[in-house]
């Protein structure tokens, strides 16, 4: 079965309507794009605007397949090896258009602008510097470039930005240890967490325990992916072995009530990405993503967009899907926003400001 791409406004047309436009349409519920929130699950290349991808490809002479041009957003189904290979290939092609420091700076500036337009006051963007190091002088120069670009983007937009350094689970665990040591060097200087991404089926979480132990000793959050393409066993490894503070996706935990209870007891946040789950075939429709079940079980949830470049839906769309497909009330949407803020690494002053804004959103007509 081919997964359907979630219906969404084009990424470039994601500007929230102003109050006059909403009134003209007769909308009576608050606009989720105006709801203050934190965005905790966004990948670096995957955050790029589609128009920027096309423009940079033309500038640098990179040929884009139809799936990234005329047929964008692509139809994906990554629950089998062939489908994941196609997804990863499209991601790698998109990454190849980022060839100069200015390209990286532009990506982060535009991403921060899009976050601000959708109510996100704090962003944690995930990057594996190994994928960019060859072009930018090595791992350390790449990390320093990303951190400097993040500071500039934050200053220009008012969005706080933290960086999560992520290891690739398809690479050797020793590579992950190298990245963990590098991430710790910049703890307190922009790096807030250490992650583990890519295909769960090709790298078990327990193989990376050493890297996560290094990161934890350095004061970084543990934020591995799990429970997306594999079931609750993968989530359990993240919780028990990697001592996860948050889990990227984690939706398959709902299949094991005992595990879900443990997640709730430990207050491990789940970074749930509805549009991505549908786009990759983890769920057939947005209504099948178990957001309501996780929420009612008491799990902390932080909605995320994952890779809007490939799924065509940014952060506000995730809240719209939860509202429309799962019947979340405005009070429940506000609680989801609060949970995203509390699960973040945002400084206390940003947390207080965003939480106050959530309360104001609920009471503003």
Residue ranges and their predicted role:
Residues 2-5, 9-220, 229-234, 241-246, ...:
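Metal-cofactor-binding active-site regions of metalloenzymes
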């Amino acid at each position: 079965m081919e997964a359907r791409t979630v219906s969404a406004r084009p990424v470039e047309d994601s500007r929230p309507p102003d109050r006059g436009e909403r009134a003209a349409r007769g909308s009576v519920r608050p606009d989720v794009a105006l709801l203050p929130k934190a965005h905790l699950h966004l990948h670096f290349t995957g955050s790029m605007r589609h128009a920027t991808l096309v423009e940079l490809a033309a500038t640098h002479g990179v040929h884009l397949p139809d799936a990234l041009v005329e047929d964008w957003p692509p139809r994906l189904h990554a629950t089998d090896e062939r489908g994941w290979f196609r997804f990863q290939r499209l991601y790698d092609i998109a990454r190849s258009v980022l060839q100069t420091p200015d390209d990286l700076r532009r990506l982060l500036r535009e991403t921060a602008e899009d976050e601000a337009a959708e109510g996100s006051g704090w962003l944690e963007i995930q990057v594996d510097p190994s994928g960019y190091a060859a072009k930018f002088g090595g791992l350390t120069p790449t990390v320093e470039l990303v951190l400097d670009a993040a500071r500039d983007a934050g200053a220009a937009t008012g969005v706080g930005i933290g960086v999560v350094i992520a290891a690739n689970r398809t690479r050797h665990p020793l590579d992950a240890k190298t990245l963990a040591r590098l991430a710790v060097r910049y703890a307190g200087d922009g790096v807030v967490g250490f992650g583990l991404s890519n295909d769960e089926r090709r790298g078990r979480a327990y193989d990376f325990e050493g890297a996560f132990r290094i990161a934890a000793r350095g004061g970084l959050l543990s934020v591995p992916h799990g429970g997306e393409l594999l079931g609750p066993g993968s989530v359990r490894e993240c919780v028990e072995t990697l001592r996860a503070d948050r889990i990227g996706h984690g939706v398959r935990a709902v299949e094991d009530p005992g595990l879900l209870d443990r997640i709730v007891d430990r207050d491990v946040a789940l970074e749930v990405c509805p549009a991505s789950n549908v786009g990759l075939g983890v769920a057939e429709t947005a209504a099948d993503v178990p957001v309501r079940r996780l929420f009612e079980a008491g799990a902390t949830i932080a909605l995320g967009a994952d890779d809007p470049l490939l799924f065509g839906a940014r952060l506000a769309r995730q809240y719209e899907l939860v509202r429309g497909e799962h019947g979340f009330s405005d009070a429940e949407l506000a609680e989801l926003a609060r949970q995203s803020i509390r699960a973040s690494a945002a400084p206390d002053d940003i947390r207080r400001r965003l939480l106050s804004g959530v309360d104001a959103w609920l009471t503003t007509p």
